[in-house]
């Protein structure tokens, strides 16, 4: 076992698995606005946000918590008026109806402008707040909370190194020389007291799932499953429970519920996808606390490992790759070993590779539930010795190589897909 990797694994999970209130792309805009206002003398009169095409795509149609509205203008406005900068991805946790009303007044008066920035950064937001002749601009780039620069009245008062330069990644990546086998060994053998923090993911995302099951949010996918179980059109059981509880959390998340998700790799839906299927299987099997914690760690770290091969935002749906983390945790809980997990991930790549990301919105919950369903299917197949082999499509002879192939697709030809998606979205 490569125990020398373990501290790095713990650090990356603590960094990438964090609470987030609301979809993280509009929240990053709200955070930039909140930071800017802290340095502004006077009342905010005007807000301008310039964002990368990918951030625009993911912010156009998603609910902003506590506002009853969707999109980047309300995120920028309410972040400026009432955001708590030190709360990071929970920047909007204490907004009030009065704050939202104030934000709407700014928007209705034409004082909030959002546009696309001509930048190479995949994740980028520059928010400028103005009061009279004074202005403050805050730039967040490369990750959802990484402040790249602060400018006050034309003077740059802070500048940071990019969060994902080649040198910084090489220095900080815990996955140098790591394989899926090393993640498996870590999750199963690391001291429990060093990884038990991951249990908080189950607590937050299960609470979000319960909120979604009330049927008040989005497309009500989780609640739809529940209603049809009650009607007798669907049976209960493991598959239905995974779909129901996982989709419900995403329903609530994407329609602006005032409950945080535990995110993964900067995404609440990815955190939900990596958490809820594992929680449901653990509940179904009535396993003990330690086994649940180890399965959650296996899931979340595998999801981060897969995502580390890809751009932070891309045309490839992140719920699909996060669910490949979930299949690792589920397969292990159901009695599978590393070989079975390997095969299950390969089957998922053979099943759902290439599902596009066309922005954050309520219908993301459908992709989350589809990915969770693929995870259940692939886990059960693997336990019976059935899987997609390296003779088929982009799937290789092992999960590590298959992940690299999937990521080559995401980082290569799908970059043009991303351009086409945004063009369709802004011109339809």
Curated annotation (Swiss-Prot):
Segments passing through the bilayer: none
Highest taxon of source: Bacteria
Organism: Photobacterium profundum (strain SS9)
Example GO biological process: L-cysteine catabolic process to pyruvate
GO MF annotation: an example: L-cysteine desulfhydrase activity
Lineage: Bacteria, Pseudomonadati, Pseudomonadota, Gammaproteobacteria, Vibrionales
Family: Belongs to the UPF0597 family.
Listed name of the protein: UPF0597 protein PBPRB0240
């Amino acid at each position: 076992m490569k125990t020398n990797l373990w501290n790095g694994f713990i650090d990356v999970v603590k960094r990438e698995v964090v609470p987030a209130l609301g979809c993280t792309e509009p929240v990053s805009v709200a955070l930039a606005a909140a930071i800017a206002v802290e340095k502004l003398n006077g009342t905010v009169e005007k807000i301008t946000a310039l964002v990368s095409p990918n951030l625009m795509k993911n912010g156009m149609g998603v609910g902003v918590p506590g506002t009853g509205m969707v999109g980047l203008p309300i995120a920028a406005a309410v972040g400026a008026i009432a955001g708590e900068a030190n709360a990071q991805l929970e920047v909007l946790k204490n907004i009030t109806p009065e704050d939202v009303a104030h934000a709407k007044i700014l928007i209705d008066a034409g004082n909030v402008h959002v546009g696309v920035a001509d930048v190479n950064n995949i994740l980028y937001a520059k928010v400028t707040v103005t009061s009279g002749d004074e202005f403050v601009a805050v730039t967040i780039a490369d990750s959802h909370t990484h402040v790249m620069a602060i400018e006050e009245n034309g003077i740059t008062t802070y500048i940071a190194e990019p969060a994902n330069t080649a040198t910084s990644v090489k220095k900080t990546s815990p996955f140098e020389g790591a394989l899926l086998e090393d993640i498996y060994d870590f999750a199963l053998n690391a001291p429990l007291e060093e990884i038990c923090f991951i249990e908080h993911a189950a607590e937050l995302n299960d609470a979000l799932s319960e909120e979604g099951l009330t049927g008040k949010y989005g497309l009500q996918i989780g609640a739809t499953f529940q209603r049809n179980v009650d009607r007798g059109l669907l049976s209960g059981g493991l598959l239905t429970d995974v779909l129901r509880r996982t989709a419900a959390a995403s329903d609530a998340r994407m329609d602006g519920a005032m409950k945080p998700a535990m995110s993964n790799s900067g995404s609440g839906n990815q955190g939900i996808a990596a958490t809820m299927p594992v929680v449901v299987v653990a509940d179904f099997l009535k396993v003990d606390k330690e086994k649940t914690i180890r399965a959650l760690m296996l899931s979340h770290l595998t999801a981060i490992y897969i995502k580390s091969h890809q751009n932070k935002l891309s045309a490839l749906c992140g719920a699909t790759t996060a669910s490949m983390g979930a299949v690792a945790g589920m397969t292990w809980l159901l009695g599978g070993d590393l070989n079975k997990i390997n095969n299950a991930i390969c089957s998922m790549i053979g099943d759902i590779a290439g599902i596009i990301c066309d922005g954050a919105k309520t219908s993301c919950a459908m992709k989350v539930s589809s990915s969770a369903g693929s995870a259940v299917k692939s886990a059960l197949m693997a336990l019976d010795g059935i899987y997609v082999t390296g003779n088929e499509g982009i799937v290789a002879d092992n999960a590590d190589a298959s992940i690299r192939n999937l990521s080559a697709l995401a980082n290569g030809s799908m970059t043009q897909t991303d351009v086409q998606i945004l063009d369709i979205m802004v011109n339809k």
